[in-house]
């Protein structure tokens, strides 16, 4: 059976596994049994566990503990007991620092980087502590620890404090403790994939060829490559690195922070109407998705609802999805794709003189940045003097404030001016096209007939306004331009 060795006592005692108690004198090296032995060192002792799952407790002096075969546990009980050498040998071996509570004014707790069968030195509060070799697993202290694994399948546990755990290669298990704990992948050589909804491995690709299990982790720091992060039901923090990162929204109150690349938040699974604003510090609040907070985010992917997506002054990518979406780039050189549905691009935030042509799908200078638009049917201008052109679809063009020019082109278009007057350019007269205009709250319509010209359409509209008893308006038709005003609103139809 197993033996028990305590070298800390004045009379060193061994329970020999056969029911006897042996007293040792001037003995410095002990070999254990093939079973689960327990050793407590003191002085410059050499204690070897051989086979079995052995347990070693650190003591005074500089001892050598050799676990031998099987899965051994080395427990460090103090920071002042000397520099022991801990050899895991074969098996899956663990060093436990959780009983170290005597650091004086610590600014750091445990610092250690495992390296397989190569000897490494741990530090406690910046001071060399123990020598480790052949150790796979580490449990930290009550202080703020930094624990890094190697190419083996490591189990790294934070215990107390605010800890940083770095798994390295292999299929690792990273366990947070009572503080705020970080799983860091800054040493990965390719992008990582994180999905906290998974049961077995929450990091399905650690960027080093392995997969990791996460428990009690509050923050995940990505690599310098293109990472993918998906949250779970808890409140998680995801921090991207230098690559182009993808953050997938889910339940829980999450914090998404991009890096220096092009970083995107993805709500494509959402079926409710979203309002997402990626200006730094902005919060997106939704009954299902919770409250998400953004920093250094460049792009948004909406869901199947009628979403409002709000960019920032940087280079944004806004993708609406399948609903009827409203997209606001907020300046910068943006790419905006409305997706399916009837989508608006809005410039309501600016007083610049916007010039935009929906028929142009390549980049165009809008006076508010170089904009590329896809699958956009509708435009809302701002407070400037805007010039807005439609395309062959059914467009809604809103002028906003300012003296605006709205050009519908083909399709059945809805052109809405602003308070300071606007021009509506008819373009070519198309047989069967319906022309509708509103003044004094009354709407008139005319369907183009065979042989109509611009002048005949203008005359028909003039007659329709007069026939609808629009008596408080001033209407002038010179054959080239129909001018109407009710005192507050002015319309020019060219």
What is the predicted function of each stretch?
Residues 1-19, 36, 73, 78-128, ...:
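GD-rich hexapeptide-repeat beta-solenoids
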Residues 31-34, 83, 102, 139-142, ...:
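Residues in short coils/turns that link rungs of repeat/solenoid architectures in beta-rich domains
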Residues 423-494:
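Extended, beta-strand-rich, solvent-exposed assembly scaffolds of outer structural proteins
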Residues 1, 7, 17, 32, ...:
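Glycine-centered beta-turn/loop sites at beta-strand termini
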């Amino acid at each position: 059976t197993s033996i028990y060795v305590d070298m800390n006592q004045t009379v060193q005692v061994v329970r020999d596994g056969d029911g006897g108690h042996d007293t040792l004198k001037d003995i410095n090296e002990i070999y254990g049994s093939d079973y689960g032995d327990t050793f407590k060192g003191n002085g410059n002792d050499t204690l070897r566990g051989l086979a079995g799952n052995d347990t070693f407790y650190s003591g005074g002096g500089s001892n050598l503990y050799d676990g031998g075969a099987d899965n051994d546990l080395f427990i460090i009980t103090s920071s002042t007991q000397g520099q022991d050498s801990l050899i895991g040998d074969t098996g899956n071996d663990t060093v436990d620092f959780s009983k170290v509570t005597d650091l004086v004014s610590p600014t750091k707790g445990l610092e250690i980087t495992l390296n397989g069968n190569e000897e490494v030195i741990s530090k406690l509060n910046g001071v060399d502590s123990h020598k480790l070799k052949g150790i796979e697993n580490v449990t930290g202290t009550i202080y703020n620890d930094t624990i890094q694994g190697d190419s083996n399948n490591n189990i790294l546990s934070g215990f107390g404090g605010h800890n940083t755990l770095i798994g390295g290669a292999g299929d690792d298990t990273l366990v947070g403790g009572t503080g705020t704990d970080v799983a860091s992948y800054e040493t990965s050589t390719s992008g990582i994939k994180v999905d906290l909804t998974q049961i077995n491995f929450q990091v399905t690709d650690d960027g080093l060829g392995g997969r990791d299990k996460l428990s009690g982790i509050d923050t995940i720091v990505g690599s310098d490559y293109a990472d993918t992060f998906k949250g779970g039901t808890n409140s998680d923090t995801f921090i991207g690195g230098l690559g182009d990162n993808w953050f997938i929204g889910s339940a829980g109150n999450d914090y998404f922070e991009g890096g220096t690349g092009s970083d995107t938040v993805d709500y494509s699974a959402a079926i409710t109407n979203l309002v997402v604003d990626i200006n730094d510090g902005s919060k997106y609040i939704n009954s299902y998705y919770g409250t998400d907070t953004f920093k250094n985010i460049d792009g948004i992917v909406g869901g199947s609802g009628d979403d409002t997506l709000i960019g920032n002054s940087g280079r944004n990518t806004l993708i609406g999805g399948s609903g009827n979406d409203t997209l606001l780039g907020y300046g910068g050189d943006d790419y905006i794709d409305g997706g399916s549905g009837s989508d608006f691009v809005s410039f309501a935030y600016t007083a610049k003189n916007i010039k935009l042509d929906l028929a142009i799908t390549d980049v165009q200078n809008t006076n508010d940045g170089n904009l590329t638009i896809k699958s956009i049917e509708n435009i809302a201008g701002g407070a400037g003097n805007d010039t807005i052109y439609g395309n062959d679809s059914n467009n809604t063009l809103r002028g906003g404030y300012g003296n605006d020019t709205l050009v519908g082109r083909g399709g059945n278009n809805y052109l809405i001016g602003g308070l300071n007057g606007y021009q509506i350019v008819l373009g070519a007269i198309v047989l069967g096209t319906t022309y509708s205009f509103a003044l004094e709250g009354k709407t008139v319509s005319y369907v183009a007939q065979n042989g109509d010209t611009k002048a005949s359409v203008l005359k028909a509209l003039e007659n329709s306004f007069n026939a609808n008893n629009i008596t408080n308006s001033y209407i002038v038709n010179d054959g080239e331009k129909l001018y109407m005003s009710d005192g507050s609103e002015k319309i020019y139809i060219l």
